[in-house]
């Protein structure tokens, strides 16, 4: 619980250190949204893969399939995995979102789809490995650098984002249950 509190405090603190118009953390009373920083990271990763699809060799062909898989995977994450993370500033401020039941539904779906999401990470890694093998023959060193970024992104999701979203759901279950008692 302590790391969760520290993480929430840091996010809240950082979000309030800028002028309001430069505040990149979505603070909302209603529907949760994927934090803009994570959404932007997804966009950047997809832009890199999109650039690789322009290669006129087998690495480009693998990149096309990788782009399709990543686009689908990121959409799933932005639909039900990452929106609860947008609630961290609200929860850190001691507030309970109005639509707690909806958010609990998202985190329950995450719990049921966790092995599927991790399997998709493995599928993405397999395509990345294939692209690395094919790119070696065509001298595309930028693919190796991209692989590091992509693996780090997946690691952060598996070690931080997925568990944090689940903790948010469990926290809301406890708070909404005690509110109704």
Report residues per predicted region:
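Sec-dependent N-terminal signal peptides
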Residues: 4-12
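Small-residue-biased structural context
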Residues: 13-181
């Amino acid at each position: 619980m302590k790391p969760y509190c520290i993480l929430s405090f840091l996010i809240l603190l950082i979000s309030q250190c800028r002028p309001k118009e430069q505040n990149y953390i979505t603070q909302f009373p209603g529907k949760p949204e994927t934090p803009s920083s994570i959404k932007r990271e997804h966009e950047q990763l997809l832009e890199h893969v999109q650039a690789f699809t322009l290669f006129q060799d087998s690495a480009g062909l693998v990149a096309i399939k990788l782009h399709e898989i990543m686009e689908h995977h990121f959409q799933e994450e932005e639909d039900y995995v990452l929106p609860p993370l947008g609630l961290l500033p609200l929860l850190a401020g001691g507030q309970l979102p109005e639509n707690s039941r909806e958010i609990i539904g998202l985190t329950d779906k995450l719990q049921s789809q966790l092995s599927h999401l991790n399997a998709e990470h493995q599928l993405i890694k397999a395509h990345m490995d294939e692209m690395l093998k094919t790119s070696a023959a065509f001298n595309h060193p930028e693919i190796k650098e991209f692989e590091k970024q992509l693996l780090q992104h997946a690691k952060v999701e598996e070690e931080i984002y997925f568990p944090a979203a689940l903790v948010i759901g469990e926290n809301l279950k406890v708070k909404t249950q005690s509110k109704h008692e």
